[in-house]
Amino acid sequence: MERPPPRAAGRDPSALRAEAPWLRAEGPGPRAAPVTVPTPPQGSSVGGGFAGLEFARPQESEPRASDLGAPRTWTGAAAGPRTPSAHIPVPAQRATPGKARLDEVMAAAALTSLSTSPLLLGAPVAAFSPEPGLEPWKEALVRPPGSYSSSSNSGDWGWDLASDQSSPSTPSPPLPPEAAHFLFGEPTLRKRKSPAQVMFQCLWKSCGKVLSTASAMQRHIRLVHLGRQAEPEQSDGEEDFYYTELDVGVDTLTDGLSSLTPVSPTASMPPAFPRLELPELLEPPALPSPLRPPAPPLPPPPVLSTVANPQSCHSDRVYQGCLTPARLEPQPTEVGACPPALSSRIGVTLRKPRGDAKKCRKVYGMERRDLWCTACRWKKACQRFLD
């Protein structure tokens, strides 16, 4: 009994594509493996209708050739199983992901360094590790600090932090105030010399002490003359009547006096002041009444001679002379001692001390306060003796 011939040999290929969808015409998608349809043997066939056909299952999309760096090849089902490979091909020109990070680390280290030139051009200090999978930034972290190095296509450079730390820079000297003013824009404080210095003189009889502050003078009067131990807050202000202000010129002190320390009474009047010779002032009848010199010329105290000017000395001594009840006619010999004081009073013009405005206190004294005007009692400008 003869078997029928195989149907596959004489069938239409379109019918085969209808029964096997994977054998249809391929579109733009991934291609399937080629189909091998061998010629049936001339003898009797052993299998069924599809015994002589070998069909391959659709292959998955292969990796792109750009990633593998190999020519475009396709493998069919007849090629056999793929052999495992221990080597993964990596393109040589591929940029390392840690290069940018290493550059940032090196830039930050160079900026924070105190060295003048942290970039040292020369041979590479160390190369990258040949181990696969070790990135350059990891290698930089493994190295000890201060031995960073990098190699790129453009050139090699390295930087040793330990060499920079071993030679610190020499500290610069401090800037003068003038240079700091120009660099930082800070206003420099100018030292202004005051044209006159205000001093305070005690008006207590035979005291004449001169101090630089009003609080010190008030404390002196309160403790020494008034015998009070009260604090300034509890005081009634009586010590204000026992001292006056003195205007002492800086130029006068520097020219006429050697220093501001107390000296002996022999150096009370400085010889450097100019002397003005006026004939009408040398005559005794022409002298005004408030400028009459006292009969016994009192030597000024040593403390007063160091800081007070001749004008203040003369005015205070004349005031003490006017308080004497007896009127003395000026003698020719005594008039000769007055021209230096008179010439100094005319030549040196300073502002009026504060104590000159309180006339009632100077005329009547502290013992006869009942004769004072109301303004003087309330420590105001005197209204009785106007200048």
Swiss-Prot record:
Spans annotated as Disordered: 1-97, 139-179, 283-305
Protein name as annotated: SLC2A4 regulator
Keywords: Cytoplasm, DNA-binding, Metal-binding, Nucleus, Phosphoprotein, Transcription, Transcription regulation, Zinc, Zinc-finger
Subcellular locations according to the entry: Cytoplasm; Nucleus
UniProt record, GO biological process: regulation of DNA-templated transcription; regulation of transcription by RNA polymerase II
Record's compositionally biased regions (Low complexity): 27-36
Source organism, top-level taxon: Eukaryota
Chief localization: cytoplasm
Cellular component GO terms held in the UniProt record: cytoplasm; nuclear speck; nucleus
Organism field: Homo sapiens (Human)
Chain location of the short sequence motif Nuclear export signal per the record: 253-263
Tissue/organ expression: According to PubMed:14630949, expressed in heart, skeletal muscle, liver, kidney and pancreas; undetectable in lung, placenta or brain. According to PubMed:14625278, ubiquitously expressed, with lowest expression in brain and ileum.
Gene Ontology MF term list: DNA-binding transcription factor activity; RNA polymerase II cis-regulatory region sequence-specific DNA binding; zinc ion binding
Function recorded in the entry: Transcription factor involved in SLC2A4 and HD gene transactivation. Binds to the consensus sequence 5'-GCCGGCG-3'.
Residues with Phosphoserine modification: 264, 268
Organism lineage: Eukaryota, Metazoa, Chordata, Craniata, Vertebrata
Annotated motif Nuclear localization signal, positions: 351-354
